Design a protein with these regions (language model features):
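Secretory targeting and sorting signals
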Residues: 2-31
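N-terminal pro-sequences and low-complexity stem/linker regions of secreted or lumenal proteins
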Residues: 30-489
């Protein structure tokens, strides 16, 4: 599907480029203090709005920065190839434990609740099936203390009411979806989504395979927490609803046509085999939504989110289905599996016209660190419904069943690190040891960079805790490359 291009877009793009030329060399502090006219001193990302036209986030699972990027890391492609191409932000932090709350935070600024911190598992969850819940968050009202809890919603449950906005809704207002195809300026790509449509999740059959906007029945059980091996008629399904933050908002799932058009399966890669001639690996062959969207800058979404399956994101060490290169079972996942995913899918992004033109930033990070790391940064405060974002007391009985020590109450999700790739604005091979950022900082940065400067919790384009006073978005320590004329790579 082609993305909707509003009339006059080309003129706006020219103006944005001229603006970038004028301000790229303007002085700024190391921590992004660019201030727009009329912004009342709000701290914004160091680059001008519109300088980065496309942002893609690849979300991996459950590793500390010291393990991922340290000596002896099994992520050899990440460290040996990608880190030299971009900037490693060492002090990047998750905002909670376990998974779901971090996915939600990065697109909405909503803080962990007891339920989202527990991945919507309950104290009586059967550890053999890991069946969770997909329940509305009730009562779902704005917290009365908006000074302390900006944009935060009170309640218990997992699915936010329709008035709670995400960066997807913000982009819909800024750049309305195509009125015929409903394709928007954002897209969420989920590997394996709908591989086994019978009994795991509900959705609309996608013409390219899988299901669109796939999630459990509202207020019903969630059967996707554990991967499902292949059957006689269906491939393995390693999609986990809890790793798809977009389907936890009624503002997205209630608009069926738009959700179907934009919450889509990632697609497939056929890994190139060694050449019979000289043994060099032949090119990979891709199919599906992502490769189709990347063919032109005007079909590439402004904001793209990529969630690998439970093996390829590193969550599962022993995999019920194949990783990117076809390995199954013990050792197929973990950082090794995540690294194989990056080794094949990141080159696809980097080969896209949008990236080669210097218009795209790629962010590779992790939802959370290991459960023993509950550190936080950036003045993170808990939300109104969970005083300890680093651990939900709903999980205590499960820890006891497993014979594991119950973690101490913690304030965050640990130091996970992030790698940012941008051929125009980031110096290859650089390491940021001074900046401190978290998932809320990232959301604030995405909003600023993509031109979302109105609305939101603060009226200046920032949602939830991304609007927290004093929160720092990506600054000159991140966008550290001196401006130069950029040519097609």
């Amino acid at each position: 599907m082609e993305r909707w291009i509003s009339p006059g877009r080309s003129l706006g793009s020219v103006i944005a480029v001229i603006g970038a030329l004028l301000v790229a060399s303007a002085p700024a502090s190391a921590h992004g203090d660019s201030r727009g006219h009329g912004d009342h001193g709000v701290v914004r990302a160091a680059l001008p709005s519109g300088a980065v036209k496309h942002i893609f986030v690849i979300e991996l699972e459950n590793e500390d920065a010291s393990t991922t990027f340290g000596p002896g890391s099994p992520a050899t492609y990440l460290n040996g190839t990608l880190v030299p191409q971009g900037e490693l932000v060492e002090n990047y932090y998750a905002t909670g434990h376990a998974s779901l709350d971090n996915y939600i935070a990065q697109i909405s600024g909503q803080a962990p609740t007891e339920e989202t911190s527990a991945d919507c598992l309950g104290p009586s969850t059967n550890l053999n099936t890991l069946i969770g819940s997909y329940d509305d968050l009730l009562p779902g009202n704005l917290d009365p203390n908006q000074r302390l809890y900006p944009g935060q919603v009170d309640g218990h449950g997992c699915i936010y009411p329709a008035f709670v906005q995400t960066i997807a809704n913000q982009l819909d207002r800024l750049d309305p979806p195509n009125p015929f195809t409903h394709v928007a300026a954002w897209r969420d790509y989920d590997e394996d989504m709908g591989n086994q449509p019978t009994g795991r999740e509900l959705g609309t059959p996608d013409p390219l395979g899988g299901l669109d906007c796939a999630h459990p029945a509202l207020n019903g059980p969630d059967n996707t927490n554990a991967a499902s091996p292949a059957t006689a008629t269906e491939p393995a399904d390693q999609y986990a609803t809890r790793h798809n933050g977009f389907v936890y908002f009624h503002s997205i799932i209630d608009n069926t046509a738009e959700c179907d058009a934009n919450v889509v399966p990632l697609g497939k890669v056929a890994v190139g085999a060694p050449s019979w001639f000289d043994g060099t690996r032949l090119p990979d062959t891709f199919s599906g939504h992502l490769v189709n969207d990347l063919r032109n800058p005007w079909t590439t979404p402004k904001f793209g989110w990529i969630t690998p399956n439970l093996c390829d994101d590193g969550h599962d060490s022993t995999c019920a289905g194949p990783n990117t290169v076809g390995q199954i079972g013990a050792g197929a996942g973990g950082l090794h599996g995540a690294d194989e995913f990056l080794a094949h899918w990141v080159p696809l992004l980097e080969a896209s016209p949008a990236y080669r033109l210097g218009q795209m930033m790629i962010v590779i990070t992790f939802d959370e660190g290991n459960s023993g790391d509950g550190t936080a940064c950036c003045g993170e405060t808990p939300g109104p419904d969970n005083a300890t974002p680093g651990f939900s007391q709903l999980l205590a009985p499960i820890y006891q069943q497993l014979g594991l020590p119950i973690p101490n109450p913690a304030s965050g999700g640990g130091r996970v690190g992030a790698l940012l790739l941008d051929p125009r604005y980031i110096e290859p091979g650089s390491v940021d040891t001074t900046g401190q950022y978290n998932h809320y900082s990232a959301l604030r940065s995405y909003e600023d960079l993509l031109g979302i400067t109105r609305g939101g919790t603060d009226g200046l384009g920032h949602l939830g805790f991304a609007a927290a006073q004093g929160l720092t978005p990506f600054g000159r320590d991140v966008f550290n490359r001196p401006f130069r004329r950029f040519l097609w790579r």
